[in-house]
């Protein structure tokens, strides 16, 4: 064990430390964190929609049976959507969803540019605008496809005029751009990360090189600050615009479609492999063992790959609710290749770890705390355990990780690494076998275990059972090591 620890300290820890302090990755992590208010607002909207429309019909189905329920006329299905106030709240939630999850890609674009510009020490507001403009500049005009399909002949011109007449009533026109919603939601993440970074870095480098318009001191600071960003912003947007134009001419396709097809989709396909999930789970524990915040170090991976998949599930859940999710899974629509009418469910997303494996924080340490309270004979451990219980309920485990400590503790490293791996295997298998719904909703990470899984799966009662099973198994894994620690002197573990 000492040899493995020494090897990790020599080769792995320096790499992890560099990753954790690399400004681009830190900016990416902060970008995802900054989006939490919008993400959770969208999650609340989805929960309200489920309570109003899904729960009543689910109760009715349980009472009548699936066969009898399927024969009901639509107006006979229970719902609260037509109830005064509650129905209005549901409609308001739809608007909230439209302003959050439907355009989460735009929110991320601004957050990414803002935090990346801040990392370079330049005007962060302008950086957010540059990144957002970069995304819009590369979006294909869907309206152009309609007009191109109509043709330029006499009939085509007449059809286009008729189309303009219909669109004009909505304040639209065939010559105006129309963007696909799939390019505005989580599907835009990879394009924003790549092209947004390129544009903002160009902007930042020019700002740092002082290639700017300087105003007299008499000009108000806000105006002077805006003028400083003009030349770098124009240069950055024209450079990415040129890239978009050249790639479009060479491939007859848009950059966002190419990035999605050749970069995003392969990563997301790999992410649904159980081995990929286990590798990330293990590395989170390994980084924590050396005192590095595992989820933060791996945030670009966790939030960059599994995060968008969670948002996709969330958006789908808002539309089809729990039964629709189950129907898609039952029909094998668990990846894009097997999508039904473009819809598919991701079995494992970012929130799956919080719901089914990281109870009380990474390593399932809430069960460690309980094991210490019940079985530890060490006074120092019991003190830390009692102090760590309340924070642990809300998934804050730093008092335990550094107070016992678990960090650099050779005895505790084994259960700290193994327990979440076992939990992930059980949860992934249960989800794949349709024994529990996948995570379809964003839940604050401080939500206590059991409640977290119940809410995250769209209030699937089976998630409660699965969580309790995993908690018991995690507890059983921790107990022998807590008992073994009793036999060691305090100095041997310090």
From Swiss-Prot:
The phosphoenolpyruvate-dependent sugar phosphotransferase system (PTS), a major carbohydrate active transport system, catalyzes the phosphorylation of incoming sugar substrates concomitant with their translocation across the cell membrane. Involved in cellobiose transport with PtcA and PtcB. This system can also transport lactose. It comes from Lactococcus lactis subsp. lactis (strain IL1403) (Streptococcus lactis). Its main location: membrane. PROSITE patterns: PTS_EIIC_TYPE_3. It is a multi-pass membrane protein. The chain crosses the membrane at residues 32-52, 92-112, 119-139, 188-208, 227-247, 274-294, 355-375, 406-426, 463-483. The keyword Lipid metabolism does not apply. This is PTS system cellobiose-specific EIIC component. The EIIC type-3 domain forms the PTS system translocation channel and contains the specific substrate-binding site. It is found in: Cell membrane. InterPro entries: PTS_EIIC, PTS_EIIC_3, PTS_Sugar-EIIC/EIIB. Residues 8-481 form the PTS EIIC type-3 domain. The keyword Membrane applies. Disruption phenotype: Disruption of the gene abolishes growth on cellobiose and lactose. Keywords: Cell membrane, Membrane, Phosphotransferase system, Sugar transport, Transferase, Transmembrane, Transmembrane helix, Transport. Pfam families: PTS_EIIC (PF02378).
